[in-house]
Amino acid sequence: MLTINATVRKEQGKGASRRLRVANRFPAIVYGGNEEPIAIDLDHNEVINQEHKSEFYADFVNLVIDGKATKVKVKAVQRHEYKPKITHIDFLRA
């Protein structure tokens, strides 16, 4: 199972998301199950390296959010129109 590290987002909105992307990070959301949705941010290089593996989309991913592991599945990926960049990911809890 793949493991990706994440941190909880303290700021939300267009400006905060743009600042994340300039810092080579991007926003994501974890939803589903009996818990509230969590807004997180991920390191772009770490995710791109994992994304090229087939189990990223086919299997569950171990998402470590501020030290707490959560089993999730990739539900949706949004990409930049012409740059090879991910702009947002939706994760669904197992």
From Swiss-Prot:
Q: Which GO terms describe its molecular function?
A: 5S rRNA binding; structural constituent of ribosome
- Give one GO biological process term: translation
InterPro entries per UniProt: Rbsml_bL25/Gln-tRNA_synth_N, Ribosomal_bL25/Gln-tRNA_synth, Ribosomal_bL25_short, Ribosomal_L25_dom, Ribosomal_uL5_bac-type
Annotated GO CC locations: cytosolic large ribosomal subunit
Keyword annotations for this protein, in alphabetical order, are: Ribonucleoprotein, Ribosomal protein, RNA-binding, rRNA-binding
Complex and partners = Part of the 50S ribosomal subunit; part of the 5S rRNA/L5/L18/L25 subcomplex. Contacts the 5S rRNA. Binds to the 5S rRNA independently of L5 and L18.
The task this protein performs is described as: This is one of the proteins that binds to the 5S RNA in the ribosome where it forms part of the central protuberance.
Family according to the record: Belongs to the bacterial ribosomal protein bL25 family.
NCBIfam families associated with the record: PRK05943.1
Stated name of the protein:
Large ribosomal subunit protein bL25
Coding gene? rplY
